[in-house]
């Protein structure tokens, strides 16, 4: 990803973390592995945070572009 990805990197990483977390959580439930369930929940939280950062970067970029075009 480039310096000018405007939050795309974080959004992609966030989605990957959320999917990875969901898989870990489900496998943890099926195997009755509480540690794996907890790791899955934590990965989903990290993914949501990264996704939010990506959205904020995207909105900041859109705002700056809007201000420059006035």
UniProtKB/Swiss-Prot annotation:
SUPFAM superfamilies: Hypothetical protein YjbJ. Pfam families: CsbD (PF05532). Disulfide bonds: none annotated. PANTHER family: UPF0337 PROTEIN YJBJ. Belongs to the UPF0337 (CsbD) family. This is UPF0337 protein BT9727_3385. It comes from Bacillus thuringiensis subsp. konkukian (strain 97-27).
């Amino acid at each position: 990803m480039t310096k000018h990805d405007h939050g795309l990197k974080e959004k992609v990483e966030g989605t990957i973390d959320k999917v990875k977390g969901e898989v870990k959580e489900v496998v943890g439930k099926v195997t009755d592995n509480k540690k794996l369930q907890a790791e899955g929940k934590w990965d989903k939280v990290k993914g949501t945070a990264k996704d939010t950062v990506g959205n904020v970067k995207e909105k900041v970029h859109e705002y700056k572009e809007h201000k420059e075009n006035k």
